[in-house]
């Protein structure tokens, strides 16, 4: 029995069913926050400099960062990733899908700190400025892209309609 199966037996009951609904709700909340006060979103980004200076809420709130700031793009993204994420959750199981998503989030945070450490060791520019610029790139966009990739690997013969018209094979 492999490690993931052992973990599922021990802590599988804590897995969050329909995790994509919660993620999409977080994106929508982030979009509303961005629409109401765009400057406040800078307080929610994944910025290692600010985390190391006491703003620990950023370890969680970066998940609220919308991948796009247009309403139509948000709707399309929400529909697409809900379908893809739900299909992956049904085929993998709730626990494994949770491990996939939360693992992606954890490694995004680790990657942000590694990049911050590299910039700090190189001594190029102000760390606060570098952290601010790089924090805008640490969003859940890459996690969403891995969902798309995982779906394409699981269902290579599936087609989606690009712009609701053009069929594209995975």
Enumerate the language-model features and the residues they cover.
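A detector for small-residue-rich transmembrane helices and their helix-helix packing motifs
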Residues: 1-170
């Amino acid at each position: 029995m492999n490690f993931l199966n052992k973990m599922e037996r021990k802590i599988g009951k804590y897995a969050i069913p329909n995790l994509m609904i919660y993620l999409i709700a977080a994106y929508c909340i982030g979009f509303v926050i961005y629409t109401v006060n765009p400057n406040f979103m800078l307080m929610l980004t994944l910025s290692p400099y600010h985390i190391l200076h006491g703003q620990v809420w950023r370890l969680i709130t970066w998940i609220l960062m919308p991948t796009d700031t247009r309403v139509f793009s948000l709707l399309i993204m929400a529909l697409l990733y809900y379908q893809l994420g739900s299909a992956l959750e049904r085929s993998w199981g709730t626990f494994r899908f949770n491990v996939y998503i939360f693992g992606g989030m954890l490694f995004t945070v680790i990657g942000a700190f590694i990049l911050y450490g590299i910039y700090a060791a190189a001594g190029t520019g102000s760390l606060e400025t570098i952290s601010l610029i790089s924090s805008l790139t640490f969003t859940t966009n890459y996690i969403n892209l891995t969902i798309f990739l995982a779906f394409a690997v699981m269902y290579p013969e599936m087609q989606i309609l690009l712009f609701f018209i053009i069929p594209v094979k995975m």
